[in-house]
UniProtKB/Swiss-Prot annotation:
Its main location: cytoplasm. Belongs to the MurCDEF family. PANTHER family: UDP-N-ACETYLMURAMATE--L-ALANINE LIGASE (PTHR43445:SF3), UDP-N-ACETYLMURAMATE--L-ALANINE LIGASE-RELATED (PTHR43445). Its EC number is 6.3.2.8. Signal peptide: none annotated. This is UDP-N-acetylmuramate--L-alanine ligase. It is found in: Cytoplasm. The gene is murC. It comes from the Bacteria. It comes from Brucella canis (strain ATCC 23365 / NCTC 10854 / RM-666). Keywords: ATP-binding, Cell cycle, Cell division, Cell shape, Cell wall biogenesis/degradation, Cytoplasm, Ligase, Nucleotide-binding, Peptidoglycan synthesis. GO terms for biological process: cell division; cell wall organization; peptidoglycan biosynthetic process; regulation of cell shape. Pathway: Cell wall biogenesis; peptidoglycan biosynthesis.
C-alpha cells in the first residue's frame, strides 16, 4: 500500500541534514504538506525554503504547530523538546529510513550500500539512468552538481537512493536492486562487532525480491566472501577482478579524468565491450564506482552509447574531490573523505592526477570524532603515503568528549614514526594559508579532507593564499 496524501502536516526534526532534506524535498514535490526545524540556517535549509517548505531555526515545542506526523533521524536525542512534545501529543514518530522506505514504494528502486563510495555511486547510477531516458527520482547523501541538490523528483518508474548502513535502518528499504561497493569495520558503536556488519549487508542483499538482483564488488575481499554466502538471489559481480561479470580494464589517466574500458560477460557466455569510456574524475575507486553504475544500467537495458554519454557528462558530487579554486598554479580541492580507506583512495587519485605534470600532493586533514580516531589510529597513521606533505588540524569533535592520548598532535607523531617524511600540526584554519604558501608550488594539488567544517577552509583557502601573497 502506498502512503496516502491525507496524512496531514509532516514535521521533520533536523530537516537540514543531508539525508532528511532530500526526503522532505521529494515528499513536498509529491504533494505532501511538509515543514521542519533545524539548529542552523544552512544552505540545505535555504534551498528547502526556496521550494516553499517552512523551516524553523532552533528546536522548540511550539514549532510542531498542527503537525500530525513527526520524522526524526538517529542524530535527534530523546530529550529534544519537539520530540518530547510530539510524544506527549501521541503523534506517530517515524525514523528517517522508514519514511524513505515509504517513498520507495512509489517506484522501482535501486539502493546503493557500502562503507565507502555510496554517494558517488548513487550519483553515477542516477546519471546513467538519466542518460538512458529513464528519468529517475533520486535521494542522495550528497549534493549532485548536475541537480544543485541531493534530491530530484523524476517522472520515470525508477528511484535511486543512498542506503546508509550506519544505524542498521537500511535493512528497512524495499529495493529491487541492491549495490554493495565494499564492507569495512565502521559504525561498530552501533553494530558491536564486524560480524554484525557482515550479517547486515547479507540481509541487505537478500532482501531484494526474486525478480531483483544484487550488484557486488569482487575486488573487495569482504564483498567477495559475502557473494559466496548469498542464497537464492541473483548476483552480478563487478570490478577489475578477472572473474567479475562487469569488469573494468585498461584504466589510465587523462589529466584529472579517467579513461577505461569495460567488458560485460553474461553467464551465457555472451560478451559486450565498451571501449574508451571517459569519467571526469580521477582515481581507481571512482572507476570502480562507475563500473557498478554501468552494471546496473546495462542490466536495465541502457545502451552503450547512452552509458558513454552519461559518464562523459557526469558533473560529480559536492565534497567529492571538488575543485574550490587555484593560486599561482596550485589547485585546491575539498573532499569528504574521513575514514582511512577513503583518505587513501582520494590521495592516490590526486597522486595519479599530478604525476603527469610532476606536481606534488599536500593533504590537509581534519580528523572527525575522537572515537573514530581512537578505533582506527594505526590505520590513520598509515593512510597518507601518497601525500608529500600532511597537515593535521585539530579534531572535529562532533559533540564528543576528548579521549586521553587521542588527538591530532599524537597523530602527527604516529604518522612520522610510521615512516612519513613530512607530517605537520596546524593549530587551526588561520595557520593553513601561511603554511601552504611556504610549501606548495605550481602544479601541486592541495586536498582538504574531513567530514567537519574543513570544507569551509577549503573554499576560503584560495582567497587567503592570494592575500598571503600581498603581504
Amino acid at each position: 500500500m502506498k502512503m496516502p496524501l491525507n496524512i496531514g502536516l509532516v514535521h521533520f526534526i533536523g530537516i537540514g541534514g543531508i539525508g532528511m532534506s532530500g526526503i522532505a524535498e521529494v515528499l513536498h514535490n509529491l504533494g505532501y504538506k511538509v515543514q521542519g526545524s533545524d539548529q542552523s540556517d544552512s544552505a540545505n535549509v535555504q534551498r528547502l525554503r526556496e521550494k516553499g517548505i517552512e523551516v524553523f531555526v532552533g528546536h522548540k515545542a511550539e514549532n510542531l504547530g498542527d503537525a500530525e506526523v513527526i520524522v526524526v533521524s538517529t542524530a535527534i536525542k530523546k530529550n529534544n523538546p519537539e520530540l518530547v512534545a510530539a510524544r506527549e501529543k501521541l503523534l506517530p514518530v517515524v525514523r528517517r529510513a522508514e519514511m524513505l522506505a515509504e517513498l520507495m514504494r512509489f517506484r522501482r528502486a535501486v539502493a546503493i550500500g557500502g562503507t565507502h563510495g555510496k554517494t558517488t555511486t548513487t550519483s553515477l547510477v542516477a546519471a546513467l539512468l538519466d542518460a538512458g531516458h529513464l528519468d529517475p527520482t533520486v535521494i542522495n547523501g550528497g549534493i549532485i552538481n548536475a541537480y544543485g541538490t541531493n534530491a530530484r523528483m523524476g517522472d520515470g518508474d525508477w528511484m535511486v537512493v543512498e542506503a546508509d548502513e550506519s544505524d542498521g535502518t537500511f535493512l528497512k528499504l524495499p529495493a529491487d536492486i541492491a549495490v554493495v561497493t565494499n564492507i569495512d569495520p565502521e559504525h561498530l558503536d552501533h553494530y558491536g562487532n564486524f560480524d554484525a556488519v557482515r550479517a547486515a549487508f547479507r540481509q541487505f542483499v537478500e532482501n531484494v525480491p526474486f525478480y531483483g538482483f544484487g550488484v557486488m564488488c569482487l575486488d573487495h575481499p569482504e564483498v567477495q566472501a559475502l557473494v559466496s554466502r548469498i542464497e537464492d538471489r541473483r548476483i552480478i559481480t563487478y570490478g577489475s577482478n578477472p572473474q567479475a561479470e562487469v569488469r573494468f580494464v585498461n584504466q589510465r589517466m587523462d589529466g584529472a579524468a579517467s579513461l577505461f574500458d569495460v567488458v560485460i560477460r553474461s553467464r551465457k557466455g555472451e560478451a559486450t565491450e565498451i571501449k574508451d569510456l571517459r569519467l571526469p574524475m580521477p582515481g581507481l575507486h571512482n572507476v570502480s564506482n562507475a563500473t557498478a553504475a554501468i552494471a546496473v544500467a546495462h542490466e536495465l537495458g541502457i545502451s552503450s552509447d547512452d552509458i558513454r554519454r552519461g559518464l562523459g557528462s557526469f558533473g560529480g558530487v559536492k565534497r567529492r574531490f571538488t575543485h574550490t579554486g587555484s593560486w599561482n598554479g596550485v589547485e585546491i580541492f575539498d573532499d569528504y573523505g574521513h575514514h582511512p580507506v577513503e583518505i587513501r583512495a582520494v590521495l592516490k587519485a590526486a597522486r595519479e592526477a599530478t604525476s603527469q605534470a610532476g606536481g606534488r600532493v599536500v593533504a590537509i586533514v581534519q580528523p572527525h570524532r575522537y572515537t573514530r580516531l581512537a578505533s582506527l589510529f594505526d590505520e590513520f597513521a598509515a593512510c597518507f603515503n601518497d601525500a608529500d606533505t600532511v597537515i593535521v588540524a585539530p579534531v572535529y569533535t562532533a559533540g564528543e568528549e576528548p579521549i586521553e592520548g587521542v588527538n591530532s598532535e599524537e597523530l602527527v607523531s604516529r604518522i612520522k614514526t610510521a615512516g612519513h617524511r613530512d607530517a605537520r600540526y596546524a593549530t587551526g584554519p588561520e595557520a593553513l594559508a601561511p603554511l601552504v604558501a611556504s610549501i606548495a608550488q605550481a602544479g601541486d594539488f592541495v586536498v582538504c579532507l574531513g567530514a567537519g567544517n574543513v570544507t569551509q577552509w577549503a573554499y576560503a583557502l584560495p582567497k587567503e593564499l592570494a592575500e598571503q601573497g600581498k603581504k
